[in-house]
UniProtKB/Swiss-Prot annotation:
One of its GO terms (cellular component) is plasma membrane. It is a multi-pass membrane protein. Gene3D superfamilies: MFS general substrate transporter like domains. The lineage of its organism: Bacteria, Pseudomonadati, Pseudomonadota, Gammaproteobacteria, Enterobacterales. Belongs to the major facilitator superfamily. It comes from the Bacteria. The chain crosses the membrane at residues 10-30, 43-63, 81-101, 134-154, 162-182, 213-233, 246-266, 272-292, 298-318, 341-361, 363-383. This is Uncharacterized transporter BU466. CDD domains: MFS_YajR_like (cd17472).
């Protein structure tokens, strides 16, 4: 990487880390402290959790279209400002409805797709996977810091301090964008070209080559949500206390990123690189089979989780990098935003389905459902394979 690429990569890593740190800190404590808010109940707490994903889905594509028409840097600043407003609302209105409205505004700053498109504008193709992998690491670091620090911060400073801290972190992110992220005009459509519309975006959604990646990230996060509905319960059945679960998550996530970086820097086999998506889906299938047969065997459960995390992190990197490689600058923001929308839809539907299935199916039946989803994903991935450049 040259200096500019390194500067851009590190800047976006810090932006993603600080922004997601503000989001993740609330996860371990919302179910407990949300009940203490005015009007709080289990349904509205669930709504306050899910509404962030819904607003992300609503605003991802509009933000992507705006980033293709105007400078991406300005759109990222707009999204961070919306995130800031959402935190101020959540911290100021001490009721469950204030939290719901604030969380909606937080999600409306839907800049994930825009950031990935901006990264692709500024980073050469041969270095793009490394940059995306670095951002993936920043996600993992923010999650690990958040699940440990969130309860501690709330214990000493109160529930609403989480949102004031998140608001401060969003200001830090805006400063980083202003002073460390360069302007790029590569994405802006020329005056003599017709600016694309929602009809054009619909064509992007239905394109079978792009659809392979949309389905891929949807299925990946759909399975992740179901996985995390089942894992804590299975660990406790095996005799592993809830207080120690974070140790397994920490170890497996760190190992998975170590394997990912070794692969990125040292794997030179073209056949493996071209088929990495299907190979990872097969490994996820293998991890589910181990998990299903593990029962109360803690070692097998951890091995299964390790294989899943390695495959998950590989797919997080290579799905987005393979897609961005096939896009021209003019439409990258729109298509990457559709991709991010698919990701949040997977999270939303995965969470809904996991709760619904858990209410009337047993452990084995849910995992057979997972196996069916993985096989369906594998079939779609093979069927939709092609080469295309827009």
């Amino acid at each position: 990487m040259n200096f500019l690429e390194l500067q851009v990569t590190l800047s976006f890593c810090v932006i993603f880390l600080l922004r997601m740190l503000g989001m993740f800190m609330i996860l371990p404590i919302l179910s407990k402290y949300g009940m203490l808010l005015d009007g709080g109940n289990k349904f509205l707490i669930g709504l306050s959790m899910g509404i962030y994903g819904i607003s992300q889905v609503i605003f991802q594509i509009p933000f992507g279209i705006l980033s293709d028409k105007f400078n991406r840097k300005k759109i990222i600043l707009l999204g961070l400002f919306m995130f800031f407003i959402g935190n101020i609302i959540s911290a100021s209105i001490h009721s469950i409805w204030g939290l719901i409205i604030g969380r909606f505004f937080q999600g409306s700053g839907a800049i994930s797709g825009v950031c990935m498109a901006f990264l692709s504008d500024l980073i050469r193709e041969e270095n793009r996977v490394k940059s995306i992998a670095a951002i993936g690491v920043s996600f993992a670091i923010s999650f690990l810091i958040a699940v440990v620090s969130g309860p501690i911060i709330v214990h000493y400073f109160g529930f609403f301090s989480i949102f004031w801290i998140s608001a401060f972190l969003s200001i830090v992110c805006m400063i980083i964008v202003c002073f460390f992220v360069p302007f790029s005009k590569k994405n802006i459509l020329k005056q003599n070209k017709t600016l694309h519309s929602y009809k054009k975006v619909l064509n992007f959604v239905l394109n079978k080559v792009f659809f392979r990646f949309y389905l891929g990230v949807f299925f990946l996060h759909f399975l992740l949500m179901i996985k995390f509905t089942m894992i804590p319960n299975q660990f406790e059945i095996s005799g592993f206390s809830l207080d120690n679960h974070w140790k397994v998550y920490l170890g497996t996530i760190l190992i998975s990123f170590f394997v990912l970086f070794l692969f990125i820097f040292y794997c030179k086999y073209k056949y493996i690189l071209e088929n990495i998506i299907e190979i990872c889906i097969l490994f996820i299938l293998f991890s589910e089979i181990i998990f299903l047969s593990a029962q109360k065997n803690l070692l097998f459960l951890i091995i299964s989780l390790q294989i899943f995390f390695i495959s998950f992190n590989f797919l997080e990197v290579f799905l987005s990098s393979h897609l961005s490689r096939q896009l021209s600058n003019n439409y990258r923001g729109s298509i990457m935003s559709i991709y991010s929308t698919s990701q949040f839809l997977g999270i939303f539907f995965g969470g809904v389905f996991s709760g619904w299935l858990y209410s009337f199916l047993n452990f084995s039946q849910i995992f057979y459902f997972e196996l069916f989803i993985i096989l369906l994903w594998l079939i779609f991935s093979f069927f939709l394979r092609n080469r295309f450049y827009l």
